[in-house]
Amino acid sequence: MAKKKGENYDSDGGDDQDYDEEPNFDDPEGFVDDVSDEELLGDFLKQKPCESDGVENVIVVDNIPVVGPARFHKLQGVLEKLFKTAGTIVNIHYPKDDEENTRGYAFIEFKNPEMAEEAVKAFNNYRLDKSHTLLVNLFSDFQKYSDIPKEWSPPEPQPYKMQNDLYNFITEPDAQDQFCVIAESSPGAVQVQFWQNTQPEPVELLTRDRFTETYVKWSPLGTYIVTFHKQGVVIWGGSNFTKINKFPHSGTQYVDFSPCEQYLVTYGPNGQKIIIWDIRTGTEKRSFISDGTSNMSMFRWSHDDKYVARMGDNAIHVYETSTFYLLDKKSIKVQGIRNFSWSPTDNIIAYWMSEDLEAPARVTLLEIPRKNEIRNKNLFNVADCKIHWQKSGDYLCVKVDRYSKSKKDKKDADVKFLGMFYNFEIFHMREKDIPVDSVEVKETILAFAWEPVGSKFAIIHGDPASANVSFYEAKKGQEPTMLKKLEKKICSHLFWSPRGQFIVLANLQAGSFEFVDTNDFTIMKSGDHFRASEVEWDPTGRYVVTGTSGKVKEDHGYHIWSFQGKILKRVNLKNFILFLWRPRPPTLLSDEKQKEIRKNLKKYYAQFESKDRIRMTRASKELLEKRAKLREQFVEYRTKRVSEWEEQKYRRMQLRNNIDTDTLDADPDNVEEEIVEILVREDTTLLE
């Protein structure tokens, strides 16, 4: 026990007590601490006061209207209403001259520096009216601009840094696709494996432990893969998946790429910021404050990355990506808008608006940037609509949920719809005046899907326990015609091949699948994958993957099937999370060249079959060599174990009273056979 400071002890009679000396906590002489205060107290030091506190919260707004006392309050109200959208305003100061006229600029203080920065990004070069465009800067920028040297010195040339080949994955001679497999290696650690789908066995390209904290996502053309971390997200690319850029946005839950991969949108937790980034430079282009509701995929992109749009209250906000300002500096007013969607090939927006008093519901096609309404369709007794574009942009289908009558609930004032039936409004986008055809179905609609390449579409309708699958075709100048109706199918989802023609009818509750060729509607094969919850085609339409993720307790893993329904590989993987094929960019060949290749495809059959035979022969040889090597290893292992067993024979006999038990079973005279009968159950049957 250590002595207490200031406590006295009697030297006489205290000999029987043993007190330890107080330990010395001082650093030894010459000790140098290699850990900085920033590493130990980083979070605490962020709160340390500094000289710029208060100044960083202030912005300077130039080019505001010069007004007198009579119009000052109106100007004050306009500016406060405008800037409070960026954050909490603490104070506003308007410098005035001797006649109480404003001087054309103002100082605004916000609650924190983040709000001030948001105000600068949102309102710098903001057009207040025809004569005034606001110029907004941080007050702390004055020092930065005043320190600019008067004499310019040219920058020093930097050595050239070799860039990654981001497109090497599409140069594979046999067009074998890549895929990644995500699994949880340990709690809080996610492993990502990258594979090449070679035949007959896939080849592992790379494995990254702790590559991401949640999941990964491919960009639309397969150039990048994004990983999620506490501080933000990182994109990777190239043959070895090296880091390309990072985007700091704490707590990012979801990301979205623009179709041409020029921009990345990061979505923070609900109620927080949404940021649009330039992928190549890593700079922030524009940020928005979420309204607190679910904001996943709040922004929707045009096919060419020229525009991005989001839905507001009775309006569509369309931004030009060259400046990220509103198109024509104003929103598109649409009273009662419920949803909208871009065409996948043209700058056309399809939106629908709900019924309002005597006005019917309406579907409208809007051409951007001229904002011309190129087609309208009025709809009556509408409960809901779903917009489905065909991938080639040739057709648009609007699924309309209609009712015979409605009833308002007295308790919660909700409207209940009775006598439901369904219409499919088919817009022929490539024909003059965009004619519209209608297909009516009385039964409940469970699923709808367009053929990506072609003019067919499929629907699942009826009772989920015994549904029907109907296939229709939309031809130019004709109404949609039913091609085939498959009855009594237990399926819930439709998955078309990206190349068209083939479709998978899936029941994700039971894990059963049917592979259908829609040329003659033959069911090529049926199969099961117990508890499978995911289905994904590869980009070429040759393979299908079904997977069971961590949502179920056992049987995690994935199966690879051919497009004909033949199962090629079963992989059981503990803590399997996700399987993702790597997307491919669209072909550079023209439509005429593709038609020519299809026409002369028979010329290449012999070449393809020869390559397949060589590949299978090589694979068979490698497989035989692998088996022979494994057999040699087993024989070597068995020989060692037999030798050890023989060496231990003397010891075994000592333990067993010098009885050689190794040969007991070999001599039948040493074996006694005993038959034991056990009464399991006794039943009594009365005979009449």
From Swiss-Prot:
Stretches the record annotates as Disordered: 1-32
GO terms under cellular component: eukaryotic 43S preinitiation complex; eukaryotic 48S preinitiation complex; eukaryotic translation initiation factor 3 complex
Acetylation is among the record's keywords: no
Biased segments, Acidic residues type: 9-32
Coiled coil: 613-642
Keyword RNA-binding among UniProt keywords: yes
Designated name of the protein: Eukaryotic translation initiation factor 3 subunit B
Organism: Aedes aegypti (Yellowfever mosquito)
